[in-house]
Structure formats: structure tokens, C-alpha cells
């Protein structure tokens, strides 16, 4: 979808200009996850027919975009909210308006929000609308509501998610897995505050670069900011005592809560929120250690994606090289870039190159992952940073006794845990692997006469830390089975008089698989192994068949 966004934004600009020509007052043009949006200041609603009349490709020749401003008839209009590079060659002709709604930025104003897409060919539009229809069937927002995982509430604030117990279970499992990965690489976990004086953000540069996303307030004469990043706090921990070359590399990890004030039109379920948790990590190391560190990070990143069932063809790394505006010497950039290239080549992964798309402080590797709907998501990132060590005057004593600057590496594998939950829900269509499922087994007693045995089965599983629950015989058995399937429960254990007398269970799994006369202890043993190994497939039922 990322490749479509420039043409979407160009289409939105064209539509906004036509609306201006018709006397409307667009105040914002931007991009959502799956469409563009235009906010129009209007006391009355705007109909679909009125919007369609405003779609006119003939305006294209008279519109250009300079420095994120629309230039039209000699006037510059500053309503574009996304800094997306837009080629003058883009020629969107085919539009689809997806939604028209109203919202109130304050009690005295009303905005009409128009959402839509635009493409250069009719075939592209048809293909996208067909894909969108399929994607809506697996929308994580609907799955989250259906499975009681999370919710959003206007009274709590837009873009601020509330995870319910079952949703938090999924997050906890993801965090536990990443803790194991971090431990295997030698990370030390830290915890840092959600709020800092803005001095730290001014030194880091975030105060300038992220000012529109920073949440800032004053208390007792000091200015504070809610953190949009974890890196400055990790830097202060590094600076808390002298370091020598023998100490390096130093690796800090944190499941850090960060907050970024995204524009309301850009918010989209868990995919774009204002508060989220990163599986963040920062490494402080010598230049000569960089290549081996990057190799390890690439290897572990691929290991993680394989664990979720993604194949090598579904994993695409990109090397982003030095942009025109950058800091650091040519020699440092060359060393860092060569280290990334060598590490990528030795990984055996095919990688692309994004020329001049590195950060201003250093080159980086971004990983894109393809889901079951064919979408590519940018998730993992490995970024080399010469800038922050310089800004914060970081030092270590080298073996010759001279103070030197360490190199810093930023890395996140999931990226945002909240966003990753959304991607997994859509990728697996709500049927998460057993180890991730909030309810792993549901026990269904056929009649009340076997409730005692059903409860013993339940309690034996819970003693082994299996997330199990029981659905007593209030409904028909077939309806209870359907409910369990619909709610994404991986395993259903059916028990009747025969099972109770023999110490067995009937096992039902996804794909309408049923295995009868299974010794409960055998099932339990296999299930514990499946969960411990974090298998993507239901290996327990495969072993029983």
C-alpha cells in the first residue's frame, strides 16, 4: 500500500482544489492507512454527489506541490499534513469515495471528512477495491471487538487503546518471547519514565524534529514532554558512569511506552495510535564491532519472523543509504554502510537498496514482511547513529587511554507491539497460534453429569499454566462448538460419560479436525510441547491423528 500513497495524495490534492473552486473550504489533506482524507470546514453536510461533481482530472495540469504546499493559480495553500514525495508525473484519473462523515474539532466548528482513493488506471482501482473488500473481512478492529481484546473510547481520547484481559494476554506473550530473544543477544532490560524535562529532547533534536507530535506541558516553572522515543533516556543511563572499551558493546532493551500526537484523520485502530509500546533496543559499541553486531541483529530478526510462520520470500530487507542532508564524515558513513552491506550479504537474504533514504545520522536496514493478504508491512529496523553520541558527548576510554565516541545502534524487531498485534490478527484472520491465543483450550461437557470430570480436566490444564476455560451445557453441543471456533479457540475438548469413565477426551481442532478416545495425559503432554516451542501450526492434533 505504501507505493499507492503518493498517487492517493495527489488525487486528494486535485479533489481539494476542485472543492475550493466550488466554494468549499478544505482545511486539511492527508493519508490514512488505506486511503486519503480531506477535512472540509462546513456547517452543513456534503453529499456523495457533490463530491463526485468535484472530481475533475482536468485540473491536474494547473496543480503543483512545492515544499508540501499546493501551488494553484499562483496561490500557495498549506493544507497538506503528510510529507510524502509526490511526482509531477502522477496522473490519478480514477477515484472512489469510501466514506463521508462529520466531526467537531471544537464545539463551534464542524468538519466534513471525505475519505477515498485515487489511481492512474481503472484496473488498479478495481484490484484495490477487491482487495479492500477481502481486507475488511479480517479487519483487526472487528476481530478485536469480537474476541474481546481491546477497545477505544472517545471519553478516554482518540488513538488511546484500552487492552482487555484477553488482549493483554497476547501482548504479554509477545513481550515474553522478545525478552528471550533479547536475553540470547546479551541485552540488559531497563525501565525509564514516561515524562522528561524538554531539555533532553532539545539536546537530542526531537524537540525540533518532533515538535508537532510532542505532548508538552509546564509544571512549577519547568517544561516537560511525554516521551516520543526511548533513546535519550537510554543514553543517560550509558552516561551515568565511565565506560571503557572492555565494556562495549553495551545493549539496553526496554518495552517502552511512547506517545506521539498523530493527527486525528490518520488514526486507524491499532495500526496508528497515539500511545503504544516499542520493543526498543539500543547498542553502544566501537566501530570495529559494528559489522558483527549487525549480523547478529539480522539473524535474530529473521529467526523471529520465521517463528511466526513467515518464509524467506515473505521477508524483504532494504538498505537505506546516505541522504543529501546528513552529518558525519565520509569515512564514517562508508564504514557503516559497508558494515551493513557485508552483514546483509552474509545473511543470504536478497535485499533492496533505497538510495538516499537513510536517516540523517546514519544508514539503516528496514525489514518489510508480507502477510497472508499479500500486503507488505515495514516492521523491524536497524539504524546506525553517529548523531546522538555526538550531541550527548558520549565517551568511552579506548585501550590507548584516549576518550572516543561510541557508535550507537537503534533496533526494534516488532516495531510497535500494538501495531504488530493488529497485523497478526489480520494475518491469521483471528485464529492465532496456540501459544499466542488468549484462550488455548475450551472444555465442553456434554451433560451436567460429567461436570466434575470436565472441571478436573480444566484444573489439570490450568495447573500446567495452559489458558483453559469451560463452557457448561447451557446451549446445544453444536452451538458451543461453533462459538469456540468463532472465538478463535485452537482446541476444544469434548467430554461425556465414556470419556469420564476412561480418562479420555475427544479433541477438536481448527479445520474441523476431530480425534476421539485420546488419553487426556497424552493430549496434555503434546499441548505443553506445542506451546513451549511456540509452534505456528497445531502440532498436537497432527501427532494425535
UniProtKB/Swiss-Prot annotation:
CDD domains: ThrRS_anticodon, ThrRS_core. It is an enzyme of class 6 (ligase). InterPro entries: aa-tRNA-synt_IIb (IPR002314), aa-tRNA-synth_II (IPR006195), aa-tRNA-synth_II/BPL/LPL (IPR045864), Anticodon-bd (IPR004154), Anticodon-bd_dom_sf (IPR036621), Thr-tRNA-ligase_IIa (IPR002320), Thr/Ala-tRNA-synth_IIc_edit (IPR018163), ThrRS_anticodon (IPR047246). Binds 1 zinc ion per subunit. It comes from the Archaea. Pfam families: HGTP_anticodon, tRNA-synt_2b. It catalyses: tRNA(Thr) + L-threonine + ATP = L-threonyl-tRNA(Thr) + AMP + diphosphate + H(+). One of its GO terms (biological process) is threonyl-tRNA aminoacylation. Zn(2+) binds at residues 231, 282, 410. The keyword Repeat does not apply. Its EC number is 6.1.1.3. Gene3D superfamilies: Anticodon-binding domain, Bira Bifunctional Protein, Domain 2. Catalyzes the attachment of threonine to tRNA(Thr) in a two-step reaction: L-threonine is first activated by ATP to form Thr-AMP and then transferred to the acceptor end of tRNA(Thr). Also activates L-serine and transfers it to tRNA(Thr); unlike most archaea the editing function is found in a freestanding protein (ACQ980D1). In vitro when both subunits are present, or if the 2 subunits are fused, L-seryl-tRNA(Thr) is no longer produced, the 2 subunits edit incorrectly charged L-seryl-tRNA(Thr). Has no activity on correctly acylated L-seryl-tRNA(Ser) or L-threonyl-tRNA(Thr). Belongs to the class-II aminoacyl-tRNA synthetase family. PANTHER family: THREONINE--TRNA LIGASE, CHLOROPLASTIC_MITOCHONDRIAL 2, THREONINE-TRNA LIGASE. NCBIfam families: thrS (TIGR00418). This is Threonine--tRNA ligase catalytic subunit. It comes from Saccharolobus solfataricus (strain ATCC 35092 / DSM 1617 / JCM 11322 / P2).
